[in-house]
Amino acid sequence: MFLVVQISCPREEHDVRTGKEYLAALNDGRTVWVGDELVADVSTHPKTRAYARSIADFYDLHHRPDLQDVMTFLDEDGVRRSMTWFQHRSKEDLLRKRRYLETVQRELGGGAIPRTPDVNNYVLLTYVDDPEPWSSQSVGTDGRDLTGGILDFWNVMRDGDLNATPAFVDPQADRSRDSAQAQSPALRVIATSDEGITVRGVKSISTGAAFGDWIHIGVFYRPGIVAEQIIYGAVKPNTPGVTIICRESNVRDGEEVEHPLASQGDELDSIIVFEDVLIPWNRVFHIGNPEHASLYPQRVFDWLHYHSLVRAMVKAELMLGLALLITEHIGTYQLPPVQARIARFAGFLQTLKAHVIASEDDGFFTPGGIYKPNVLMFDFGRAYYIEHITDLTHELVDLSGRAALIYPTEGQWERPELRPWLAALQTGPVGRPHDRLKISRVIRDMFLSDWGDRISTFENFNGTPLLAIRSLTMKRAEMSPTGTMADLARKVCGIESVTGDGEPETAYLAQADYARRQDGTRRNAR
């Protein structure tokens, strides 16, 4: 873990959590299963402690003097806070935020820890940016104003520098019929009272819920979903009736040398069971309106998706670097065919970087004054990553040859009777033989292990899979044949608009104005 050093000046209030404070907060009586074991304290159990320590390292990064200007900012009251809570209100602000997001990924294994608190909490911007529709469009609140609770939750999270892990995915119902959704065990409201709503059911996937301070509940709209299943809000993991059931762990606890990435911990995707759990009204963000939920499968996660593109860019840089290092060590780098193959990684990185920069350059201002990157740019950038990552993973392993698969353990390397033979096998034109082991271990952990395969699967379905990215993103801009996107084609073809004078009614324009204002397309403000 990192050494924590106080970096604030004597009169400056410092409100940034330390790793020690984070770890202490995890021992709160939450019910967590990992595989067949009931874990009493996720900060100390061998299957969970490594990841808890990695998140603690995330917090301690904010206390490094050399990173103060990158990791923290002074708010309007002169309080130094984590950049997690920085609301970017200009393009320059967004670039500062991106530098922060990149730094976190670079310092924590180049993408080995995808769901850090900075990305988990980024989602909350959607609510606080424009809270009114979340309240006014709710059904079943008896006229209660939910906006105060939404804004208060942001303040509680910010002031405590906490971590809210999203839980949005419902069980896979029989998708051959829409009516099956209503019969699924998905989380639903079973009662309302003056205190709040009582919920019962399941959220089938939540990444890192065992390690969060709060569980951020939401829903991805599906045809056939019923009003009782539309719930957005927050509960603490130790709330009575909440059980977190994690899959089997892939962590290589205590094997930092042999498994430099897998030893950093496993995020542990989980099922969360809610058995008659009370959510107070001040932690309810929205309930009861499937039409409202249908507008937000992507929009509520826009900030997470922008982050996932930044993370993909960092991972592409790591892959390019690994390809350069391993081919240099085995002596194939100078071969023209090999350099042509390495160029694919360079192109992959530059294309992702272009999507990031273009999304930032063509950004817009949301209703709450947040400067937001171009939605089409970062979502189709995510699609590009998913379309190409599998092929490039195979390319990297193929360029590595046996170096990624057959190499000695550290214990074998340290045996004097074996070292001369093993060193000869790892000797190339440049570099030390032991360095090749270090490169090979990273390639193996990231791309040839259960731990690495889990991250690859996560990235393919993070937020939305490829088909959903394409279909949902097409609904985020004017893509109808009668819309403006076809104006140039109509002009070149000499075709008049079929709608006559005035603005054509299209599927996109039929969406609620408050939702389209989160997209930033040129016609949204009309």
Annotated model-derived regions:
Residues 166-311, 478-524:
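FAD-binding core of flavoproteins
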Residues 49, 53, 155-158, 198, ...:
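Generic structural signal for well-ordered, non-transmembrane alpha-helical segments
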Residues 73-214, 221-233, 243:
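Glycine-rich flavin
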Residues 9-73:
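Acidic/polar, glycine-rich intrinsically disordered N-terminal extensions of enzymes
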Residues 376-523:
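Alpha-helix capping/hinge segments and adjacent helical runs
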Residues 336-343, 371-379:
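Short, charged, amphipathic alpha-helical segments
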Residues 56-59, 327, 349, 353-356, ...:
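A structural signal for well-ordered alpha-helices, especially hydrophobic packing surfaces
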Residues 307-365:
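Extended amphipathic alpha-helical segments enriched in small hydrophobics
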